[in-house]
Amino acid sequence: MKAAVIYQKGELPEYVDFPEPVAQNDDELLVSVKAVAIKHFDKGKAAGRHYSSSIPRENGQVIGGDGVCVLDDGTKVYGMGVSGMLAEKATIEKDRVVKLPANLSDATAAALANAVIGSAMGLRFKADIQPGDVVLINGATGFTGRVAVQIAKHYGAKKVIATGRNTQSLQDLLALGADEIISLNQGDEQFLDQLKKSQLNGPVGVIIDYLWGHSAEMILGSSKGKGSFTNKIRFVSVGSVTGDLIQLSAANLRSVNLQLTGSGLGSWSNDQVRLLFSEILPEMFQLASDGKLKVETIEVNLKNIADIWNLDVSDGQRLVVTI
């Protein structure tokens, strides 16, 4: 079979002939792959930068962890790979499969899944979002951030405040459900002043953060209390695009009802992952099929994997490899 394979961490994937995988037990299924999204996670893992990275096997390793595929009976599903997914054939986990709506495109389904995982899991299980919450999404102009804005609204957020640097992408977020946008290109004082004004009619209760770094420091610092009663703030770290470390005053933890947590591989319970596949993903795929959850994709062919691996994709779009 043809596949995208890496032989050394950090090298470009190669389009080569590779042995077809074999299901090792009854919990695995051999499938034909149709579409796989290329995410920051995939690039980081292939380069050895992600905490879940492993050293490629000596004879090469197929990359890609999830995607749209077809079962033996012709059913089209989203699945999580046991073997790498950027190949004509792959093995997937039998209990981590979601049947796809008939009119949902392969590219949309492939692109949407990881963004749902990177937004809905944090909103639902880490932030415990409730109808009427005011939600701040820090770094909302990226692909997952755009999905997070829409899902927060779907879950009943009264107001969604979105931050980001790309001016056009920030404007686009208003059409996707954001009620207010705040640019990260302005000075610190201006940013903090706008953040304060955005909460005059109700304080932020949920913060989904894709950036970490200085903007997270400012947001957390602005929440510091003065000894009076405060509303509960659930701050959920999902990404660290602008830095892996921050400075946080201990007073932030003592002076405000702050719940500081993260959402990612290793932070969810087995029950939460089961709900992801049995409830959350099916619901979100259906919303996308109905035109109520919107994403933008760029489709490329597997044979061009080396040429497009480092392609500069615009904010809010996802690269999808079709097979």
Which ranges hold each PLM region?
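Mid-domain Rossmann-like dinucleotide-binding core that forms the NAD(H)/NADP(H) cofactor-binding site
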Residues: 112-187
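Glycine-rich cofactor phosphate-binding loops and adjacent beta1-alpha1 units
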Residues: 176, 180-258
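NAD(P)H dinucleotide-binding glycine-rich loop of Rossmann-like/cofactor-binding domains
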Residues: 63-66, 76-139
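Short, glycine/polar-rich helix-capping loops at beta-to-alpha or helix-loop-helix junctions
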Residues: 85-87, 165-174, 245-250
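Glycine-rich beta-strand-centered segment in the early N-terminal region that forms part
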Residues: 21-42, 47-85
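C-terminal hydrophobic helical "lid"/dimerization subdomain
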Residues: 271-323
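Rossmann-fold dehydrogenase core element
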Residues: 228-239, 247-292
